[in-house]
Structures are given as structure tokens and as C-alpha cells.
Amino acid sequence: VYNISTVVDQTLFMDIMGFKRMASETAASLYGVFSGKYWVLINVPIALANSMSTAMIPAISGSYELKDYKKCRGHVRQAIHFTMVISIPAIGMGALAYPIMEVLFPQKATIDLAVSILRTGCISIIFYALSTVSNGVLQGIGKVNIPLRNAAVSLVLHVVLLTPLLYFTNLNLYALVFATMFYAFLMCLLNNLSVRKYLGYHQEMKRTFMIPLLSSVIMGILCYVFYQGIYLILSGIFGSFIHLR
């Protein structure tokens, strides 16, 4: 379903943009910014969540089969906490979106758009990471069809949102960003409701979400301020040097 969603997004975007008389080269270029820049960067922390969910399946399966549900919930809590400690600070990419894009994808024609959609959609990292871990939890307790069902439901609702956004607004690439954020949020929500249903798991909020989020906000602000300060200082130094020469 994850792979299907990518194909669906590309097909809808290209077809609807063509219907709205956008040149196919322009539409392809826009989608390339989404898939080749934004999505590549977003997937880095999500890949770490994937590895975490894969590694935790044996421990969760073992404790679940032994009917040690308390220990099983402990494994789930540790996995979610560890994943959030990685993924929540990763939204700091939004604060440093321009220098990141300037280093990795320095094409001047699309850098401003790539920076803007990264800043807009970086929060989806949290939703994708959490849904990935909850996928692993559900697979670990033998509910392998539940994540598939949740992803299918999320995909249908994703298409229901994306289609009118593309048809009736001029959001263009931002419609894709908003719709994929919605898709990730729905998967996250449905998977976590399923984990609660089958394990009786209730998520602790302060240590797992609130503290990393507060720390990440402070980190993002400081990184942005220091980057801008250093940039202005170095620009002044090099500008003066060039002027003297």
C-alpha cells in the first residue's frame, strides 16, 4: 500500500495538472522536486524508524506469546520513545531547510520551492515514524492484516482529499504535501487505536512527546539564529575582503 500511494500520487498529480493545461514538462519538474528532494530527505529519519520496528518484532512477539502483556507493553513503550527521540528532532530540518537544500540539491531554479515544501511538510516525519513503529507492533502480536487494512483506509481518504485539492485549488505541489501529511496522520491514528485495542496500551505523553518536542523547538530556534548570525558575519567578512581587493 505504501508503494501504491506513491504511484497514485504521481498519477493523480500528472493527470490533473494536464487537465488544467499545465505543460507536462512543468508538471514533471514539480513532481520531481517532491519525490526527488522533499521525499528523499523526509525518508532518512523514517528509515531509522523502519529499522527500529523490524528490530523490536521478536521481543514483542516473544512476550506476547508468553502472555506477559505487561512486558510486551514495556517493549512497545521503549520502541515508541526511542523512535520519537529520533524523529521529533528531525523536524528541525525545517529550520535549516535552505542550507540543507543548498548543499544537497543546489539547483537554483527549484531550491526555493524545495525549501518551502520541506518546511511545510517536515512534521509528517513524526506521523510516518510512529505509524511505522505501530505497524511493527501489530505484526509482532500477529495482527498482520490490521496495518494493511488501516493503510488501505488511509489511502482512500488520502485520494478523497488530494483530488479536490488538485482540481479546485492552485496549491499544486502543496496539495501533495498536505495530502501525504493527512495520509500519514491517519495511518498513525488508526494503527495506534488498534494497538490500544489489542494490547490495552496507553501512551505516556510527557517523556515520549512533550519533552522531545520542547527540546526540538528550542534546538530549531537556536540553530536558525546561529546559522543566520554566522552567515551574516561571514558575508560581511568576505564582502569586505573582496571590496578591499
Predicted regions and their residues:
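Alpha-helical transmembrane segments of multi-pass membrane transport and lipid-handling proteins
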Residues: 76-127, 160
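Membrane-embedded alpha-helical segments of multi-pass transporters/permeases
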Residues: 7, 11, 91-95, 103, ...
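Residue-level recognition of pore/gate-forming positions within transmembrane alpha-helices
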Residues: 78, 125, 154-156, 181-184, ...
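Helix-loop junctions and terminal segments of transmembrane helices
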Residues: 46-66
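Membrane-interface junctions at transmembrane-helix termini in multi-pass inner-membrane proteins
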Residues: 123-153
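Alpha-helical transmembrane segments
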Residues: 131-142, 192-209
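Alpha-helical transmembrane segments of polytopic membrane transporters and translocases
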Residues: 27-49, 80-82
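Membrane-interface helix-loop junctions in multi-pass transport and translocation proteins
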Residues: 145, 155-189, 203, 207, ...
